[in-house]
Regions:
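Ribonuclease/tRNase effector modules and their secretory precursors
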Residues: 1-127
Length: 127
């Protein structure tokens, strides 16, 4: 795992990259995707039940989405959502919220969670 410091000087981990072809198609910046230790702790705390059900930790959940997303949707404000969309139960979407940090040229993970597809489908599809 690539480690460094985020803009608040907290350790962060590179979890992937928004690839050039996808970024171009979605009109987004091609850049590394990073997550801070603080956000991993936040995800673990807020979504421990879901993570235990899946049998994975917060890092593995974020990495799973970064490696397997099949949609990008507009998030709130300037954020975007990387989404694994699949049919099934109430929580049939896995999503991470990313915000682009211009000064560091990275996409930072702000949260990751299972979501109801109805909420996600209301968001503009970018890719």
């Amino acid at each position: 795992m690539a480690k460094g410091k985020d803009i608040l000087q907290h350790p962060y981990i590179k979890v992937g990259r928004l690839k050039m072809n996808v970024a171009k198609a979605a009109h987004l910046k091609c850049a590394d995707i990073v997550v801070s230790q603080n956000y991993l702790k936040h995800i673990e705390k807020k979504h421990s039940t879901e993570l235990k059900t899946l049998g994975i930790d917060s890092y593995s959940y974020v990495k799973l989405i970064v490696d397997n997303y099949n949609q990008i949707r507009q998030g709130s404000d300037d954020s975007v959502l990387l989404v694994i969309f699949r049919d099934g139960n109430h929580h049939d979407v896995a999503a991470i919220k990313l915000t682009y940090i211009t000064s560091k040229d990275v996409w930072e993970v702000k949260t990751a969670q299972p979501r109801n597809s109805k909420d996600v489908l209301k968001r503009k599809l970018l890719w």
